[in-house]
Amino acid sequence: MLFSDHPRTHYRNAPAHEVICQLRFPSILTINNVEPADFQEAIRAEFPQYARRQDAAPPRITGLGGPAPKVEQQPPVTNHNFVSEDNQWKLNLTKDFIALSTLHYSGWEEFARQLDKPLAAFIRLYKPAYFQRVGLRYVNVFSRARLGLEGTPWAELFTPAYTAPMQDAELPEDRFLNCACDLTVKLDSSCQAKIHAGPGMVKRRGPNVPQDPEVKFILDMDLSMTGNTPCTLAAGALETLHGHSTRLFEGAITDRLRDAMDAE
């Protein structure tokens, strides 16, 4: 089962590792060339820390199919980073997108509230024509140790849509060197989801940081709405994607896992 109509539930032991919202728009060159001082002032109370980096842009290839195709290097893209005082929230602004991310997701309502003000300020100051892509990504990482489920097979915690090979009782779980599932699913006329699911290791970032040896289950759901979304409908588009994400998440897990995550 890929989708479930199980009621939306808030879990005390929620597995969300990172949540990212990104809205792409037709390029606004001013963002790349002029410091976003007015935008910073509008959001500075919530995102007081600022940094800027130059991201390498992919090269452009011209003359494909001809006798002498050329690879043209593109100028770097300025990525403006605004970070909350507690370092829990990060806002990125480039000439092509605005994005909000957090490693401490507590629920959709708070996430939407954190996005409201910067998104409204961005629309007011930069007046994008529309949003070409509205994206919402949930990277969920399930730890059996954290949930008190050590020794419980993944096949008992996740539905066969994501664990079909591991449902074979004759083959021990540790025999699978790779058992990942990658799907692209159409959700409705304008929405789709790219899903990666399966056991894996989560690498900790930073120099000399000790790595966690526990094998975890990763459920990475990257949902998007394409087509030209009017700015006034961006919030509604995100609500639609969130609704789809709930059905996908609940469709991936079993009642055994729901119990361990401790529904409120």
Enumerate the predicted regions with their spans:
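Aromatic/basic-lined ligand-recognition segments
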Residues: M1, H6-R8, P75-V83, R133-V209
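N-terminal low-complexity, intrinsically disordered segments
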Residues: M1-L93, G227, L233, D262-E264
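Glycine-rich, often proline-containing surface loops adjacent to acidic residues and nearby aromatics
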Residues: P15-Q22, W89-Y105, F131-V139, P213-M225
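Short amphipathic alpha-helical segments
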Residues: E35, F39, G107-Q114, P118, ...
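Conserved short hydrophobic interaction patches
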Residues: E46, Q114, P118-L125, H244, ...
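Short, highly charged C-terminal tails/helix-capping segments
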Residues: T62-G65, V134-V141, D255-E264
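Hydrophobic alpha-helical segments and helix pairs
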Residues: S84-Y126
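C-terminal structured interaction module
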Residues: K216-E264
